[in-house]
């Protein structure tokens, strides 16, 4: 695992720093968790595409964003956006478009709680007004 300090929007510089510790000519897994809700849809698609272009065939891309379909979720997104950073409540189809032409791994784009069917949610985790949507895709 390699951690670099940089601006994710500067893909070329970030990838150069990563390449100092990771062989990007071999398959890797790129995690972009809780990141893309800070980007407008077109900017998110562009950002993901720039990173995916650097991945070797057989690599995996994992994306997740927070979102919600309730008044409470809308209030939360609004409150956050009124502060230091604008956040976007991406729809599921919009989020799915961030994967571009990549092949999604089953079960596809789903609520994170549905990623492992049959898994019992611990009793101490209450239902939420919002959700986390996730997806995993494999590069060709």
Stretch-by-stretch model annotation:
Residues 1-140:
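Alpha-helical subdomain
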């Amino acid at each position: 695992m390699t951690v670099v300090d940089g601006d994710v929007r500067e893909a070329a510089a970030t990838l150069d720093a990563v390449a100092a510790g990771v062989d990007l000519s071999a398959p890797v897994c790129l995690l972009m968790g809780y990141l893309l809700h800070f980007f407008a849809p077109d900017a998110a698609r562009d950002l993901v595409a720039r990173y995916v272009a650097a991945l070797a065939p057989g690599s995996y891309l994992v994306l997740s964003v927070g979102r919600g379909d309730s008044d409470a979720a809308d209030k939360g997104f609004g409150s956050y956006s009124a502060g230091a950073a604008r956040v976007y409540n991406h729809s599921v189809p919009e989020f799915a478009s961030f994967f571009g032409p990549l092949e999604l791994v089953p079960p596809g784009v789903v609520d994170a709680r549905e990623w492992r069917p049959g898994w019992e949610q611990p009793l101490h985790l209450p239902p939420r007004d919002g959700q986390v949507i996730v997806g995993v895709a494999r590069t060709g």
